[in-house]
Amino acid sequence: MKRVLLLLLCALPAAAGPLEEAGLIDVQTVENLPVFVSLRYATQNNFTGKKIYSSAKCYLHKDAVEGLKKAVSLAAQENEPFTFCLWDCYRPQDEHRKLWQAKPDPSYVAMPKRGSRHSRGMAVDLTPCDFNGNPLKMPTDFDSFTKEAHMDFYDLPADVLARRETLKKIMTTAGFTYTRTEWWHFDKKGWKSKPLLNVPIP
């Protein structure tokens, strides 16, 4: 009897964690979503020079995931098809405060008292890449904090400018809005209705 009970317990699905209860999903567990995850803040390869995240998993709210699915589908239909490499996804509030301490400039990092849209699971930082995960040429690297990263900067090589505009078109069609100072940052519409979270990334 004990053995049967143990087998039944093992067959039950794992209990949802606090992120899942808030509607967030581990992007790499989503079927038919061929994206690459390379969280910069899970490494030292970011503007702080320090590892900010203890986990390299990309969590997004299910609404943002649906938008990302649409963006991936649209990118695959381009004359030169591509997919995306995700640089940042859900960001706990504690980790966001660390970024603010390193760059206390609201033009680039949201003020902690207002909270980041990343902390709602409704923002994603990404770049176009080929289907082997190699990033395509874009105006700047991630978190460059320069005028060249601005969406209204046009003194760029023709192919780079065209790719940035294609990215903007795809993401806005998929239900995201863009940020003027960061070509890589997109917010899913409806983010205001989602709570700020400070749950560690598992």
Residue ranges and their predicted role:
Residues 13-14, 93:
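Residues at or immediately preceding the N-termini of alpha-helices
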